[in-house]
Design a protein with these regions (language model features):
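Alpha-helical transmembrane segments of multipass membrane proteins
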Residues: 18-23, 49, 98-102, 124-128, ...
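Central hydrophobic cores of alpha-helical transmembrane segments in multi-pass inner-membrane proteins
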Residues: 8-24, 38-51, 92-104, 122-124, ...
Length: 498
């Protein structure tokens, strides 16, 4: 019975739980709010597990579909479904939300109910965006998740939180208005808002495709974010609380890249081929130049934020590598796998930074040193995540990057060679930070007073470590889910619409 409504449950359980948490009222009821938030996040995660276990790896198209009329007059419907790509993001989002609720358990003392509720509501909205089969429904969820994210940064962020949250809101909103225009144009062509109908349009002139490409691209590129519209991300990460940074890096950035896969590539294949060289150049700039920028950062959060931009450059590179008019198989699948891996690794890195910040209240690398002497268990976990961020084999960080590099070499050796620089830069800035923070003499007397991770922090880091190692040692479990959906997308993009 419930199998027919799994996606609706994945969307609405967190949202309803968020409303219930809000209803707990003042801070004096914080323990109740935390327990309700944990129950809601856990239920939201558990309901996504049948999506993975029950997913048919051999069949293409959408599964677990739901359809209900929403606004019949405008042919706008509540239509849901997941394919081999989106199903992984729904599960990842629910998983990270559970980790975020645990991460903020004892840390957030100011308005904890509202804090937990914002994450739960945002989780449901993000799941809605990943599962939507109606373009206007996607737009509502895609834009709606900005409101709780804006509040998370603006209320619980650092000293410059208002600046960071407003910058984030303006950047993303300006791009999204153009996407709305493009969606309305396409709806006139097919008489509705079904994304599959958009994808199955037989003929779109190249000039129109190019205009639509620009409209969609500006919206999704800001969300990824791609160079040069990336400047909001470091500010947002630095000011956001730990949970905000975890969700921002692990989930929110993936919405932009998912938009490329769901809208731009299948609906506008000729424009995608036309603009592919531009996307490749911008992606390589993100991989190489932003990697160099990360090398000179003194703030740990800002360093990992620039690292995220560099890794997401790898993702967009993999999505736009064409050979004889066809998308490269290895690169496309590698891009999706890299997104899932980055979700685990970036969340873990920001969790590690949050653990240290909670003890010393500074993110400056120079304020640390010798942490291994007082926090050996924490140092071991951070070593694993730092290695994964650098792309060490047997960790999840290696799999997607290796697949994209293999695909890039098939397209052009020099593109592959430049892309491979991310392995060098990733190791350089990540291990440089790790060495200065964890090893060496205790430079700050306050470091000597730091306590090792408690049971709650150990549990969060251990679960993330299992995810990073599990995906690195057995990536086939993820690749086989993505395989058929990626092949269907490649076949679709190969057909010209001119």
């Amino acid at each position: 019975m419930f199998s027919n409504y799994l996606l609706s449950l994945a969307i609405w359980i967190p949202i309803v739980a968020g409303v219930l948490v809000l209803a707990t009222g003042p801070d004096s009821r914080a323990p109740l709010a935390r327990v309700l938030a944990l129950i809601g996040a856990l239920a939201g995660f558990l309901v996504t597990l049948p999506l993975f276990t029950g997913f048919d790896r051999l069949s293409g198209g959408y599964q677990f579909t739901e359809f209900h009329e929403w606004i019949p007059l405008l042919r706008i419907n509540y239509s849901l479904g997941v394919d081999g790509i989106s199903v992984l993001f729904v599960i990842l989002n629910a998983f990270i939300t559970l980790m975020v609720v645990l991460a903020g358990w004892e840390v957030i003392q100011k308005r904890p109910a509202q804090y937990m509720a914002a994450f739960l509501i945002m989780s449901g909205l993000i799941n809605g965006a990943f599962a939507a089969r109606d373009a206007l429904l996607f737009y509502v969820f895609f834009e709606g998740m900005l409101i709780p994210l804006y509040l998370i940064i603006g209320v619980w962020g650092g000293p410059r939180r208002v600046y960071a949250s407003v910058k984030l809101f303006l950047y993303t909103l300006m791009g999204s208005l153009l996407m709305l225009v493009a969606i309305v144009y396409l709806s006139y062509q097919v008489g509705g808002f079904a994304i599959e109908d958009f994808q199955n349009i037989k003929q779109i002139p190249l000039g129109v495709q190019q205009l639509l490409f620009v409209a969609f691209f500006l919206s999704f590129a800001v969300k990824v974010p791609m160079f040069p519209v990336h400047t909001w991300l470091p500010d947002a990460h630095v000011e956001a609380p730990t949970g905000g940074s975890m969700v921002l890096a692990a989930i929110t950035l993936k919405l932009g890249a998912y938009g490329f896969l769901r809208f731009i590539l299948p609906i506008l294949p000729d424009a995608s081929r036309y603009f592919a060289p531009v996307i490749i150049v911008l992606s390589l700039i993100a991989v190489v130049y932003i990697g160099m920028v990360a090398l000179v950062q003194t703030d740990m959060k800002k360093l990992v934020a620039y690292s995220s931009i560099s890794h997401m450059g790898f993702v967009t590179l993999g999505m736009f590598l064409f050979i004889n008019g066809q998308l490269n198989d290895w690169a496309l699948k590698g891009a999706v796998i890299q997104m899932i891996s980055h979700g685990f690794v970036s969340a873990a890195m920001f969790m590690c930074i949050g653990v240290m910040y909670d003890r010393l209240h500074t993110r400056n690398i120079a304020d640390y040193g010798g942490v291994v002497n007082v926090m050996p268990k924490f140092a071991a976990f951070m070593m694993l995540f730092a290695m994964a961020n650098a792309g060490l084999p047997a960790t999840s960080g290696f799999v997607g990057e290796f697949m994209v590099i293999m695909g890039a070499v098939k397209v052009n050796f020099w593109v592959g060679a430049l892309a491979a620089l991310t392995l060098i830069y990733g190791a350089s800035y990540t291990l440089w930070m790790y060495k200065r923070v964890i090893f060496g003499a205790v430079g700050n007397p306050h470091v000597a007073d730091m306590k090792d991770i408690n049971c709650r922090e150990f549990a969060i880091l251990a679960i993330l470590a299992v995810a990073v190692l599990g995906m690195g040692l057995y990536p086939q479990a993820f690749i086989e889910v993505v395989h058929q959906a990626a092949n269907d997308l490649i076949a679709h993009v190969a057909q010209s619409k001119i």
